[in-house]
Amino acid sequence: MAARGVGLLTRLPVCSQRRNRIPRSISRLLSCPGTIAASIGSEEQSSVVAETGIEDKTLQKKFSEVQKERREQAQRTVLIHCPNNINEKKFLKYLSQHGPVNNHFFYESFGLFAVVEFCQKDSIKSLQNGTHTPTQSTEAAIPFKSRFLNLRLKNPSSQVSGQPFVQTTNQSPPSSKKLFELLSYAESIEEQLNTLLKAFQLTEENIRLRHLTCSLIEDIAAAYFPSCVIRPFGSSVNTFGKLGCDLDMFLDLDETGKLDVHKNTGNFFMEFQVKNVPSERIATQKILSVIGECLDNFGPGCVGVQKILNARCPLVRFSHQGSGFQCDLTANNSIALKSSELLYIYGSLDSRVRALVFSVRCWARAHSLTSSIPGAWITNFSLTVMVIFFLQRRSPPILPTLDSLKSIADAEDRCILEGNNCTFVQDVNKIQPSGNTETLELLIKEFFEYFGNFAFNKNSINIRQGREQNKPDSSPLYIQNPFETSLNISKNVSQSQLQKFVELARDSAWILEQEDKNQPFSSSRQPWGLAALLLPPGSGHTSLSRKKKKKPMSEKVKGLLASIKSNSPDSSTDTSGKRTISTQA
């Protein structure tokens, strides 16, 4: 369930952890989930992205390092439901009794909430020790101690007297009306793409909240599996997530039962007594079933819990009311996390990548090419891989192939998952930046031209090698899974949906071709450039563009028919140039 009226306000850290400022060019490139600029704060973000996208990447961290830092950050954090009339200074003074506060912000979901990060985990224990279980006259409370807390005022009148309410800023993506206004006032198509990216990308606060939600669910799962880890994956961590997207997470049990090599000495070998089941799938179903029951019965704020255990990938789906996220929990989904890391690498290499992906996804959503309901539609993941493939095909390439990333990997990068070679270099700083200087305006137009004329009937898309290959089967759209190479990630796409994509891509390429690049129509407040591409089907601009595009073809057809008829013995032409039908036998 998405949050209503979500808003956030960042507060500066007060701990003694000093952070160096970084150049604006770096913060532009890294202003995405899980990067250094994200951890430093939104103040370092720049509103303009360099045209070439070739930027210094020396300060970038590995995906695993970022996720580790985020997890540790979340473990020092609590989520507090606050009264609307809370006094912020008194609130922080109260919390400081338990230890110094490193960072905090407020947001609105189903009420007012505060995310508070302490400097030490022990501060949370102190806070919990001073927290009591509520008593109800008509209902019985289940005494489950978590880091999701509820703050009540002893004397509400003393809190509001002469004190301003806490400030919140809107964390929801802009409305369609606001987006078209922003895009129409931009000075170039390049600026439009970057404006859309800035409006939709995950904020620092939203990223913190996603990791905190995973950490809260981990506390519940740890009751049965003390060494488990709940890891976010997908759009929440791969730099391509947009505000309002679902939170995908998986239960990682790899740490459970691992040997401590320092204590594994002597002549004996100890094992846990465990239950055995016929297959790993059944084990996964049983584990998720139990976790689902725990979330439903004991998880504060977890509502609408559904156990979808017979799916190809068993999962538990639920809404987390405190954060406002719709959550999907799976188990031991390591390949999905590795795919997230690969997209993180690609999204961090060049600032044009994310801008192009966000715009293509938004375009697809505007024309109902993608859907939140499972079916025959193209997925956001497929669209992202198509953009990556297109950028690999540029001259010179903007993005390297997966095989080339594998070729520069070292022993530390080696990764085999479920028999699949998932090895690629994990350090972005080892990857040579591209010398390609093409603008986003050119790239988005040529993306639509490229796939509007792609031979989908015979070729497949392969980012591992970065070249077109013959399709191994008759699927309308074949995009090879980067790691499980025998699988097609777009197997669900129907022929009709692919045809719709191709037609819309051709229309969009034509619209961009007709734009007067030197004189954007921002002064007229009419949709142009990217904004024109996002107009819904049937709107004036799109309909007109299609009519204009089809008119020359219809004239050619009419001319061809006229030529055929003029050469027929059954027709002739009078002196006015009009055709007349002969009545002669």
UniProtKB/Swiss-Prot annotation:
Signal peptide residues are: none
GO molecular function, a single term: protein homodimerization activity
Which stretches make up the PAP-associated domain?
441-486
Q: Which UniProt keywords apply?
A: Acetylation, ATP-binding, Cytoplasm, Magnesium, Manganese, Metal-binding, Mitochondrion, mRNA processing, Nucleotide-binding, RNA-binding, Transcription, Transferase, Transit peptide
Q: What is its EC number?
A: 2.7.7.19
The biological process GO terms on file are: histone mRNA catabolic process; mitochondrial RNA 3'-end processing; mRNA processing
Which transformation does this protein catalyse, written as a reaction? RNA(n) + ATP = RNA(n)-3'-adenine ribonucleotide + diphosphate
Q: Gene encoding it?
A: Mtpap
| Compartment(s) of residence | Cytoplasm; Mitochondrion
Q: What residue spans carry the Polar residues bias annotation?
A: 564-585
Q: Where N6-acetyllysine occurs along the chain?
A: 90
Tell me one Pfam family matched here.
PAP_assoc
Provide the transit peptide span. Answer: 1-37
Main location per UniProt?
Answer: cytoplasm
Which residues are listed for Mg(2+) binding in this entry?
246, 248
Q: What is this protein called?
A: Poly(A) RNA polymerase, mitochondrial
